[in-house]
């Protein structure tokens, strides 16, 4: 029986309020409106950014369906959709690509103005309404994607068509974690061969930064984490050295400066803590070092630092979705994965049924997982 043009009832993980477990509910998913597509989600990763909403570190409206790193198949399309059709394999994009705003038109930009992750997220579609209801209540969208559900609706500019032969339970990581880390190196920092790099934080995104540094030909890749259990994987993926800040009496930026002579060429903060952001900045060369903020900064916290850190010549950059123009880059990244130009399997430590979403988040919070993928 065709579902086209009809409301679909399906299972979703609803977060009714902060600091509570996800609740598996039956939700109604409305048909896509003009320029929108409805996607049957096949696999979705659990990312630290989702947990930031649970803890309140990332402010979002409630109730909400989280999830933003996924892959699925187009179930139906709304009017005026031209780039996608039912049956297409797709990856939803939390950074859309409208192709018309200044960021999209600039060779230097990728943060499309149509995103819903900037300073005041609405949790709604472009027309100011939601496509999800549960128990008679409107449920908010998350960064234009909402993938912790069997079906979701996204704007046409927020989905990239990919190779239908790609394993969706692997390439879903290209929807966030892998691309964010890998691109921070290749697109944002533009690390050169022979460079020295430091990577703060060895979760899924941090390990993807390590992979990017190796791909760029960095000669030293120093991985920094307080969980030494992550060091073996970091070395497997390209880290040349691994250090634990807890093993030293002096600040970690001093340790790195001593290890490298005058500091690293490039540092990457992939945790989302203001203390490590300033430490990463201080760790890079005082005159030409580049430090990139990759971890999502905590809401309502301000950063203070010695301006001499910048005055001497350092560059401090941010990177959203690895600097990739999403709709253009994601199909190419999937193609590169299919050509074995990089691996994703080492990042996926757990594959769980969707019903075990709360267990997946527990694995993340206790540091026992790198990436858990939920299969719907």
UniProtKB/Swiss-Prot annotation:
Keyword Cell membrane annotated: no
A cellular component annotation (GO) from this entry: cytosol
Cofactors: Zn(2+)
Gene3D superfamilies referenced in this protein's UniProt entry, alphabetically: Medium-chain alcohol dehydrogenases, catalytic domain, NAD(P)-binding Rossmann-like Domain
InterPro entries attached here?
A: ADH-like_C (IPR013149), ADH-like_N (IPR013154), ADH_Zn_CS (IPR002328), GroES-like_sf (IPR011032), NAD(P)-bd_dom_sf (IPR036291), PKS_ER (IPR020843)
| EC number(s) reported in the record | 1.1.1.1
* A GO term for molecular function: zinc ion binding
Positions carrying N-acetylserine? 2
Domain of life where this protein originates: Eukaryota
Q: Principal place where this protein is found?
A: cytoplasm
The reaction(s) annotated as catalysed by this protein in its Swiss-Prot or TrEMBL entry are: a primary alcohol + NAD(+) = an aldehyde + NADH + H(+); a secondary alcohol + NAD(+) = a ketone + NADH + H(+)
Residue positions binding Zn(2+) 2:
98, 101, 104, 112
Localisation per UniProt entry: Cytoplasm
Binding, Zn(2+) 1:
47, 68, 176
Q: Where does NAD(+) bind?
A: 201-206, 225, 230, 294-296, 371
* Oxidoreductase found in the keyword field: yes
According to the record, cofactor stoichiometry and binding are noted as:
Binds 2 Zn(2+) ions per subunit.
An example Pfam family from this entry, by short name, is ADH_zinc_N
| UniProt record, GO biological process | retinoic acid metabolic process; retinol metabolic process
Q: How does it assemble?
A: Homodimer.
By sequence similarity, the record places it as follows:
Belongs to the zinc-containing alcohol dehydrogenase family. Class-I subfamily.
User: By what name is this protein known?
Assistant: Alcohol dehydrogenase 1
